[in-house]
């Protein structure tokens, strides 16, 4: 269940990276994934490549932080295992919910959200899911780039269609946060926190993020593309490139689940949450979200357009997902779409 980047998403600037990526990288990676030594001659025969082409593919692996061990007379062997996605394992972990989904696993792409937004406009089926081993231009909120490296995180998007349209999607990112938190707890990660409106934290460090893009009529049928990135096992180079404190599942769960198992659990929880959200909105998830609220009753500031906008006490969220901010002027309702929000503690906590 693997494919290549397709459609209009290939015209964006990061597609240049895809075009020049060594096309033999993933076939080579799968050959070496057994942990055994393979000679250059064996690799060339299996891949139909010259020794020179094998060398270039090896170099491509090194650029992804997967430099194989080379031993004269024996060949190449990966020094660490690579946790690639397996459709059958995802389906097993997802259970009965998997019947409602249509999963596609890509080796690499610019952005799963970009691909699925294009698919949504072209009539892609409800429940379509695109997951990717290596995302080259993953997007977060406010135009930030999501970084995880090859097989260092889960990067995937789901298309969910709603009869009620965009007007009924208030609080969707918070409900999705509840689904991700439930799945992480199933996977053995205790102490998951939620940050309004769309981050998953642990001990104040970012563990996962959500990006939702919508389309359709304000009061008619609509669709949401739900992009999720979860840090599963970040290498040192990726951590260094991220401009905020981060943590990964491998550092929190013992034993850590495979990426396939974790993806299956997240998809299962998403189907349950989105089905209920379609009927009742965010209200049924409000109390559960607030129990995990990272900044409940703390003094916070919200930043809009990169400068200080408003400060107050985070009192929780309303039934439509609005942040309730207490101040000397009373309680303000902050709607996710109104501000570019970056909640930061003001009391040193």
Model-predicted regions and their roles:
Residues 76, 199-200:
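Positions that flank functional sites
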Residues 194-198:
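Alpha/beta catalytic cores of group-transfer enzymes, especially the acyltransferase/condensing modules
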